[in-house]
Amino acid sequence: MARYRCCRSRSRSRCYRRRRRCRTRRRRCCRRRRARRCCRRRYKLRCRRY
């Protein structure tokens, strides 16, 4: 299982493998494979499409 990957800007945020740790804790990636979706901690890491 790959670790959580970081999401960049607010608009069109996507997941990246290169960044191991996120600068902002609220933005983290989905657990699903091949999913370039970002999640927010407030809603139990629910996935949102951008």
Curated annotation (Swiss-Prot):
Expression (tissue specificity): Testis.
PROSITE patterns membership: PROTAMINE_P1 (PS00048)
Assembly with partners or alone: Cross-linked by interchain disulfide bonds around the DNA-helix.
GO molecular function terms listed in the Swiss-Prot or TrEMBL record: DNA binding
Matching InterPro entries: Protamine_P1
Protein name per the record: Sperm protamine P1
Function: Protamines substitute for histones in the chromatin of sperm during the haploid phase of spermatogenesis. They compact sperm DNA into a highly condensed, stable and inactive complex.
Subcellular location: Nucleus; Chromosome
Family to which this protein belongs: Belongs to the protamine P1 family.
Gene Ontology BP, a term: sperm DNA condensation
Top-level division of the source organism's lineage: Eukaryota
Keyword annotations from UniProtKB, A to Z: Chromosome, Developmental protein, Differentiation, Disulfide bond, DNA condensation, DNA-binding, Nucleosome core, Nucleus, Spermatogenesis
Cellular component GO terms held in the UniProt record: nucleosome; nucleus
UniProt keyword Zinc, yes or no: no
